[in-house]
């Protein structure tokens, strides 16, 4: 009888990346990436107080929030900014960039304002993109009040942090995108699903877009009667 010894690497099992990702998901494991700092304040930029403490938020467009996260690619990173309606959790606009310049954030903001009108309050962290003149001036010109999280307090913007967690576990970590166009297409599909089909416990299982537009329509009907 041949001696029994430890298994050699050659005796292992060949599996592809898709199976590895599926098994990692089942075991609730996530890949480890070096996370870029997307919330670093810029020297000399003005910061603003946090305005949401104790505030009752009960309607669309009362408060929006925005944040940036990183998208791990097969090689390197891209960056994603999203603008969300706080009350309904609907993603109003988003952009992907390969740099952390403020331009892609302002583009998303302009799209959201163009489609939905300005919010009463915009809440962000103190990252340099959100303290930049281009961002703050755009908000001031439409009469939006600016609110910023306390430094290092991610819970001040908790709903968009939850969005990032869902996006990464349900979409980003399941892929290894090669190009920005692949990432953009994948993110776009997921956000469309999230807005229009994904049940949300905060509103009785209704998707964010359904809650947003139904509430807007109801408010307009009430105003018309009044």
Give residue spans per PLM region.
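Charged DNA-binding/catalytic regions of mobile-element recombinases
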Residues: 1-226
């Amino acid at each position: 009888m041949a001696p029994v010894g430890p298994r050699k690497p050659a005796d292992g099992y060949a599996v592809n990346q898709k199976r590895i990702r599926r098994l990692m998901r089942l075991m609730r494991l996530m890949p480890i990436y070096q996370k870029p700092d997307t919330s670093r304040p810029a020297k000399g930029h003005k910061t603003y107080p946090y305005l949401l403490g104790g505030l009752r938020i009960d309607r669309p467009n009362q408060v929006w929030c925005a944040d940036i996260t990183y998208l791990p690619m097969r090689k390197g990173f891209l960056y994603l900014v999203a603008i969300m309606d706080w009350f309904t959790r609907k993603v109003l606009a988003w952009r992907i960039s390969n740099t952390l310049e403020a331009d892609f954030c302002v583009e998303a903001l302009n799209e959201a304002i163009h489609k939905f009108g300005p919010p009463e309050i915009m809440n962000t962290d103190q990252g340099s993109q959100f303290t930049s003149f281009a961002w703050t001036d755009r908000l001031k010109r439409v009469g939006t009040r600016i609110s910023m999280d306390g430094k290092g307090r991610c819970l001040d913007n908790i709903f968009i942090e939850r969005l990032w967690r869902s996006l990464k576990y349900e979409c980003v970590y399941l892929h290894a995108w090669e190009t920005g166009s692949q990432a953009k297409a994948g993110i776009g599909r997921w956000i469309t699903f999230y807005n229009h089909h994904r049940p949300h416990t905060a509103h009785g299982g209704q998707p964010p877009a359904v809650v947003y537009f139904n509430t807007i329509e109801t408010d307009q009907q009430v105003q018309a009667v009044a």
